[in-house]
């Protein structure tokens, strides 16, 4: 009886061993376990490549601003400043143009406003689309608006720098002769503005 059973057992054991061997071979060759993934990369090659790329790249500039140097001059408070917020504030508070009933445009047409002059002025116009809008001068003493005691300044449309000094402003208006302008000088006498003279100019 022992000889009868031994042959089939051997055959079944051989069959099982063959199945195990084939499945082990298939598992070793699966797509998730490739020979490329198992091939080690020498660490010295990768590190050397990365360090070469980093060292050859130019260093980025720093975004921090350079500190100001002592050679940079401060803003001059005595310089002409037609963009001063004082001008816009004063102009916004003026009575409207009597001819058009419109407010005044806060952007000066001309002027020499600064905070240090005994007398300075800006020329403004009515905020209208008229061909010849009303113009006027606004006078300042040490950068502060002079609201009272000022002669009529309507109609002036420019400043003559040749006749203007630290305490005198020469305002101009067109004359009846083309190309000629008339200058009227306003002077700060220490207490108020006074009219000096009319001078015809070119």
UniProtKB/Swiss-Prot annotation:
Membrane topology value: Lipid-anchor
Residue positions of covalent lipid attachment, annotated as N-palmitoyl cysteine: 29
Lipid sites, type S-diacylglycerol cysteine: 29
Name of the protein in question: Putative lipoprotein LprE
Pfam families: Lipoprotein_21
One term under GO cellular component: plasma membrane
Organism: Mycobacterium leprae (strain TN)
Location relative to the cell: Cell membrane
Record's keyword terms, sorted: Cell membrane, Lipoprotein, Membrane, Palmitate, Signal
Cleaved signal peptide residues: 1-28
